[in-house]
Amino acid sequence: MKRKALFVMVALGLLSASQAMAQSKIGFHAIGASAAFVSPQDLDGTFGLGVFADLGQIAPNIGLEPTIEFWSKSQDQFGLESSLRDISVGMRGKYYFQVANPKVRPFAGAGLGIHFLHAEATATVPGSGTFTATGDNTKLGLDLGGGISTALNSKNDFRAEAWYGIVSDVNQFAVRVGISHKLAM
């Protein structure tokens, strides 16, 4: 299933690439970093980090953005320590709306990501010792969201965005802020 999902993502990207290249401005236009408040399903909120790149436009007003994001949450209740970690690698498409003020660029987007999940639980039972269980899983996720991007100066942009990630058993809502740095092209 994991290989099939990865194959479908790559195939769709390659099939659409030839048409898109004719009208696109693809290349590394900017790189950036973000910080987030992430609220995973059935867990308290936590802090997340991410990096991203602006690959330009594949069509008028449609930008392409690869992302790598990370968050981790640990809890200790009644002698049971548990933690869940998510590292996601994904690709998002963003539609930039035409507005009267070109300094503020609102967008809505969607994307796919592969989530590498790791869970661990440790319980200490008096007289019996410590028991630990771990589990790893890889899942495909769908991201839906939007936000704004605005120039700080000629080389740097600020962005604020909200994304909802639909990932089996680990849906998550994230509010992110980030800075991107434009590369010389």
Model-derived features: where do they sit?
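Outer-membrane pore/translocation modules
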Residues: A22-D44, A100-P102, I114-K139, A184
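Glycine- and aromatic-enriched membrane insertion/assembly motifs of diderm outer-membrane
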Residues: S24-Q98, S149, N153-D157
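Outer-membrane beta-barrel pore domains and translocons
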Residues: S34-V38, T67-W71, G111-H115, W163-G165, ...
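Outer-membrane beta-barrel translocator domains and adjoining extracellular loop/strand segments
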Residues: L43-L49, Q75-S83, H118-G129, V170-R176
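Outer-envelope exported proteins of Gram-negative bacteria
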Residues: E65-T67, G90-R92, R105-G111, R159-W163, ...
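Outer-membrane beta-barrel "beta-signal"
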Residues: G93, N171-M185
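A charged, solvent-exposed segment within the mature domains of Sec-exported extracytoplasmic proteins
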Residues: G127-V167, G178
